[in-house]
C-alpha cells in the first residue's frame, strides 16, 4: 500500500464550506470488491461527519450486469444492521472521473492505466469474492473494511491539516 500523500484539493463549490476530497474505488466488473469498498466508504464518511468534505465514486472498466450474489449476502451480515447491496448496479467509470480523484483504490484486478501525477493510485490486490466460499468471501470483506477505515484515517488527518 502507498504511504500517505498530501493532495491538491478541488476548489470548493459556492455551496461548500470545506474543500472536497474525492475517493474512487475501481475494479473490472464493479460487482464485488469495489462495491463493498464504496459501501464501507459511504458508511465511514457518514460516521465521521465528512459528507460535505469527501466525495466517493466507483465503477468498473467492464461492468457486470449485477452485484455478485455472494457480496450481497455477506454485506447483509455486516455488524450494525447490515449493508444492503441488493439494488446495487455496477457501472462503467471513465478516466476523466478518475483524474478528478485524490485517491483511486483498485482492487487488484483492474486493467486501469491512469497516468496522472496528481492522483494517488493504490492497488489493494484483493482476491475476488465471486466464486469463493462464504468464509473466504467474508475475509475479503473484512480486509476491504479495514483498508477503507485506514484510508479514512488518512483522509481525515489530511483534511484536518489543510483546515
Can you say where each PLM-predicted feature lies in the sequence?
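A secondary-structure boundary/capping signal
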Residues: 27, 107-108
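Phosphate-binding/catalytic loops
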Residues: 6-8, 103, 109-163
Amino acid at each position: 500500500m502507498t504511504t500517505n500523500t498530501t493532495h491538491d484539493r478541488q476548489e470548493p463549490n459556492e455551496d461548500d464550506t470545506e474543500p472536497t476530497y474525492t475517493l474512487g474505488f475501481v475494479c473490472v466488473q464493479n460487482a464485488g470488491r469495489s462495491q463493498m469498498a464504496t459501501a464501507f466508504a459511504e458508511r465511514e464518511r457518514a460516521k465521521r461527519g465528512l459528507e460535505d468534505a469527501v466525495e466517493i465514486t466507483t465503477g468498473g472498466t467492464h461492468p457486470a450486469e449485477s452485484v455478485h450474489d455472494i457480496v450481497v449476502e455477506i454485506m447483509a451480515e455486516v455488524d450494525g444492521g447490515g449493508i444492503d447491496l441488493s439494488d446495487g448496479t455496477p457501472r462503467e467509470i471513465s478516466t476523466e472521473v478518475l483524474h478528478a480523484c485524490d485517491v483511486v483504490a483498485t482492487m487488484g484486478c483492474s486493467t486501469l492505466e491512469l497516468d496522472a501525477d496528481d492522483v494517488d493510485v493504490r492497488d489493494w490486490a484483493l482476491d475476488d469474492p465471486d466464486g469463493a466460499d462464504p468464509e473466504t468471501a467474508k475475509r475479503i470483506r473484512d480486509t476491504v473494511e479495514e483498508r477503507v477505515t485506514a484510508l479514512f484515517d488518512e483522509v481525515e488527518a489530511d483534511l484536518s491539516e489543510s483546515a
